[in-house]
């Protein structure tokens, strides 16, 4: 299993790209550019809210698991 890092606004790179692609696949309006910007923040916030994930609006271990259904 891959250990995904916790991501927050301002982060950049491959894992942000993967998170954006997963959000896009699930129907959220987000650019896949590898930059955790305000649009990514809004999409992630909506995803977390719709899946009853409490806490900070970061992409953490719980969020990754729900994104990938494992």
What are these regions (language model features)?
Residues 1-34:
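Acidic, Ser/Thr/Pro/Gly-enriched interdomain connector segments
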Residues 24-28, 49-53, 64, 68-69:
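Sec-exported extracytoplasmic/periplasmic mature domains
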Residues 44:
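Conserved hydrophobic/aromatic packing and binding residues within compact polymer-binding modules
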């Amino acid at each position: 299993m891959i250990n995904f890092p916790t991501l927050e606004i301002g982060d950049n790179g491959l894992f942000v790209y993967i998170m954006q692609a997963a959000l896009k696949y699930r129907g959220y309006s987000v650019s896949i550019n590898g930059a955790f910007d305000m649009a990514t923040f809004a999409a992630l916030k909506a995803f977390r809210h719709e899946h009853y994930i409490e806490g900070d609006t970061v992409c953490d271990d719980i969020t990754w698991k729900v994104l990938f259904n494992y």
